[in-house]
Curated annotation (Swiss-Prot):
InterPro entries: HD, Homeodomain-like_sf, WUSCHEL-like. GO terms for molecular function: DNA binding; DNA-binding transcription factor activity. SMART domains: HOX. GO terms for cellular component: nucleus. This is Protein WUSCHEL. Residues 36-101 bind DNA.
Length: 281
């Protein structure tokens, strides 16, 4: 019994001192098997320095069983160490390096994502289809397009017909205080057209718009002719319009003479005839 116990004790001591390894050539990798010990390894500063030098400078990432034995034999000069401690140190160091690279990649990815703040947000532009013009205001038109010019006491309403397209832009046509015109709404006194606002297009075709434009121009021409005729009639009326209803079929007596039908007699002759008729009546 004693020789068997001595042989078993010598085998255990030899295994602890040399750190017997087992190489798995079939899988292409290496694994190191050793007897587990209850004591925890506390590496010294020199041991850590040698291991980092092998890992970073010499490029040793996955050492084989022979390399682990040589490394552990060298490190025992600086403190207590086993072969399994060398094996696990390289495994843990590789895992930490992979985790560090993954964290760095995720950090750069989040840094490249643009962040949108509230002060960077710009609301879309809002265009008012129905423009209201207050009295005494001078609305400005963008992009050089002409608009309305209103004077105090005026009001223009637009009820969904869009902007009136005029062929002759910047055409002024003043309207008297007693004349009212409907151009998509109501227009009062002291309003002048100075242009058009082409910001919104007519939803109808160009042909319909052209017809409407021509009809509008013809309406303006008819109004101008009516104003000229009205002015001419005012100039030819007699000074006293109340005598215009007097019929000229009766005889007019003046200065001892008889004349029939004198529509354009002078004021003196008209008065004499009127007094003469009243005397005989």
């Amino acid at each position: 019994m004693e020789p068997q116990q001595q042989q078993q004790q010598q085998g255990n001591e030899q295994q602890d001192s040399q750190g017997i390894g087992k190489i798995n050539n079939g899988s292409g990798g290496s694994s190191f098997l050793c007897r587990q010990s209850s004591t925890r390894w506390t590496p010294t500063t020199d041991q850590i320095r040698i291991l980092k030098d092998l890992y970073y400078n010499n490029g040793v990432r996955s050492p084989t069983a022979e390399q682990i034995q040589r490394i552990s034999a060298k490190l025992r000069q600086y403190g207590k160490i086993e072969g399994k401690n060398v094996f696990y140190w390289f495994q843990n160091h590789k895992a930490r390096e992979r985790q560090k690279k993954r964290f760095t990649a995720d950090h750069h990815h989040h840094m490249n994502v643009p962040t949108i703040h509230n002060h960077h947000y710009k609301p879309p532009p809002v265009y008012n289809k129905f423009s209201n013009m207050n009295s005494g205001s001078f609305p400005s038109s963008s992009n050089g397009s002409p608009g309305f010019l209103t004077t105090p006491g005026s009001h223009v309403g637009n009820y969904g017909y869009g902007s009136v397209a005029m062929e002759k832009s910047f055409r002024e046509c003043t309207i008297s205080s007693t004349t009212d015109a409907n151009v998509g709404g109501s227009m009062s006194q002291n309003i002048a057209w100075i242009g058009i606002n082409n910001e919104y297009h007519n939803p109808y075709t160009f042909i319909d718009t052209r017809k409407y434009m021509n009809g509008y121009d013809q309406t303006l021409e008819i109004e101008e002719e009516a104003e000229e005729n009205y002015t001419a009639e005012i100039e030819t009326l007699p000074l006293f319009p109340m005598h215009a209803d007097i019929k000229q079929d009766t005889a007019d007596y003046f200065n001892g003479r008889l004349e029939n039908g004198c529509p354009r007699a002078s004021l003196e002759l008209t008065l004499n005839s009127w007094f003469g008729n009243s005397k005989y009546n």
